[in-house]
Amino acid sequence: MSAKPQPIAAANWKCNGTTASIEKLVQVFNEHTISHDVQCVVAPTFVHIPLVQAKLRNPKYVISAENAIAKSGAFTGEVSMPILKDIGVHWVILGHSERRTYYGETDEIVAQKVSEACKQGFMVIACIGETLQQREANQTAKVVLSQTSAIAAKLTKDAWNQVVLAYEPVWAIGTGKVATPEQAQEVHLLLRKWVSENIGTDVAAKLRILYGGSVNAANAATLYAKPDINGFLVGGASLKPEFRDIIDATR
């Protein structure tokens, strides 16, 4: 197999953090010497982005938003892509299962957002994944490929340079259940094959596919050893110093 593309270790803080806890954690990140080629991403709440921008000094990191809408205007409570760009944020997580589950974001809505973000120059971490019911009904492939094809339908081939896929089995998020490295690799390989056949072998070779779902310091290295796992989208463990060990696991 050809060499893996540059890995990504992404911290999705979700709706968590206080000024004090974030300052403490960012200090830990700043003091962490990372000696290999890896893109670290941290996604704080919108409110905490300026704090992290002011305090984070580790050059391996970029700051991401956890969500965004396409345009500014009369959308109370939302934050738009132009506003994020204006404050210097150029990465965004879109389609996280919590957005899909709690806020009714359909495959179509997520695909439209990913397309808009690419057009506006963002790097996008686009999330896909199946529920426990879907996995038990043997629908994993059908679900993740329909989510991926919805996104692909709205993207030019060039736009894939700005897209990172994150496979997050919904049944493994925050539950302590983790897909086995074999289960995760099976889905990652399926996704890469689909991209290879439908978008291009060149795109598939460069595409970073992250795993998300109860990733921690204990399981990260075993997961990363699989050929089609290119890093992680980390929830709970990214709020702890343990995130350093997950970054180190992507060597």
From Swiss-Prot:
Catalysed reaction equations from the record: D-glyceraldehyde 3-phosphate = dihydroxyacetone phosphate
Enzyme Commission number: 5.3.1.1
SUPFAM superfamilies from the UniProt entry: Triosephosphate isomerase (TIM) (SSF51351)
Catalytic EC class: isomerase
Superkingdom of origin: Eukaryota
InterPro entries named among the record's database cross-references: Aldolase_TIM (IPR013785), TIM_sf (IPR035990), TrioseP_Isoase_bac/euk (IPR022896), Triosephosphate_isomerase (IPR000652), Triosephosphate_isomerase_AS (IPR020861)
Binding, substrate: 12, 14
Record GO cellular component, one term: glycosome
One MF term in the entry's GO annotations: triose-phosphate isomerase activity
Compartments where found: Cytoplasm; Glycosome
Pathway(s) served: Carbohydrate biosynthesis; gluconeogenesis; Carbohydrate degradation; glycolysis; D-glyceraldehyde 3-phosphate from glycerone phosphate: step 1/1
Subunit structure: Homodimer.
Similarity comment: family membership: Belongs to the triosephosphate isomerase family.
Name by which UniProt lists this protein: Triosephosphate isomerase
